[in-house]
Design a protein with these regions (language model features):
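Bacterial N-terminal signal peptides
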Residues: 14-24
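Non-catalytic, mobile gating and regulatory segments of ester bond hydrolases
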Residues: 29-152, 156-303
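Bacterial N-terminal signal peptides that target proteins for export
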Residues: 2-15
Length: 303
């Protein structure tokens, strides 16, 4: 195999990567990894899946779970849909954000370079941040004082929900745990560090490629501006088993798939139906296991 990263440039790149890894050690998530409740994850998955359904079905699920549907809307420019539901008894409001209907086209069309965000000072994916700002402006007048806010979303909607959590946090709203499913990356290492105070769980299936996007590019190492996941990654394994990964470990998992291409065929591993199916047996009791890895640092550079 011919390396896509010339050997003469590997040395400096690996040194830069070592610096990146040393910086990331301090970016642990605020999530209590011993407090993962799969019944909670299943309910959030139901709400994430509901964002793809007609309004009548969203309303029915919300009422079944003790909520009233407050708003259901689709952003015209991006076709990202979301809903806001209010639970008076629990004094909780829930925001669920849908991804796009065609993930392959959406992920191929996005600009992969991060852009500075004036509101947060962070470098964020421009399209996801723009959608999050639109949702923020629409829900802000409907958010109630003294209520906690739950956020969830699938695919691109998960990335939008995560950025929305940052905007809400900075605006002083009380956030509950944020749970996303199959979410792509949306910021860099500095941005991930800013998320330490937010309890963010990213649920993934082992063969879902969307959470590995945009792909790791070793050429960005020199600028310490590589795309990086925020929060804690929960990997759904067979039956009752699961693994938990943070920053470095999550990145190392991604390097095993850097040469695979997103296609309609492997999107079967990305669908919410599979996420619900894999979470269900864990609601009665789950077993945390180590995530197997055969990582080799030279694999990043095509060696």
């Amino acid at each position: 195999m011919v390396s896509r990263f010339p050997s003469a440039r590997r040395g400096p790149a690996i040194l830069s990567l070592a610096l990146v890894l040393s910086c990331v050690i301090a970016t642990a998530s605020a999530t209590d990894t011993d407090g993962i409740d799969f019944s909670e994850l299943y309910e959030q998955a139901e709400f994430a899946a509901a964002a793809y359904r007609p309004e009548a079905e969203i309303r029915a699920l919300a009422e079944e779970r003790g909520y009233t549907l407050t708003l259901h809307h689709t952003l015209e420019a991006t076709q990202v849909a979301f809903f806001l539901a209010t639970g008076e008894a629990a004094k909780t409001q829930l925001i669920s954000i849908r991804g796009t209907s065609n993930v392959v086209n959406a992920m191929l069309d996005i600009s992969v370079k991060l852009k500075p965000d004036a509101d947060t000072g962070l470098r964020l994916h421009e399209g996801f941040a723009a959608a999050a700002k639109q949702v923020f402006e629409e829900v802000k007048p409907l958010l109630l004082q003294g209520y906690r806010i739950r956020l969830t979303g699938h695919s691109l909607g998960g990335a939008v929900a995560s950025i929305l959590a940052l905007y809400l946090d900075k605006a002083g709203f009380d956030l509950a745990r944020v749970v996303t499913f199959g979410q792509p990356k949306f910021t860099n290492i500095a941005g991930a560090a800013e998320f330490r105070r937010i309890d963010l769980i990213r649920v993934v299936t082992p063969a879902d490629l969307v959470p590995l996007l945009p792909p790791f590019d070793p050429l960005d190492i020199k600028d310490l501006d590589v795309y990086w996941h925020a929060g804690t990654e929960v990997v759904l394994l067979a039956d009752t088993e699961y693994a938990v990964l943070d920053g470095i470990d999550s990145m190392l998992r991604a390097t095993r798939f850097t040469r695979q291409t997103l296609s309609e065929e492997n999107l079967a591993y990305h669908r919410m139906a599979l996420y619900l199916e894999m979470i269900a047996p864990k609601t009665g009791g789950a077993v945390r296991v180590p995530y197997p890895t055969d990582f080799n640092i030279f694999n990043i550079f095509g060696g």
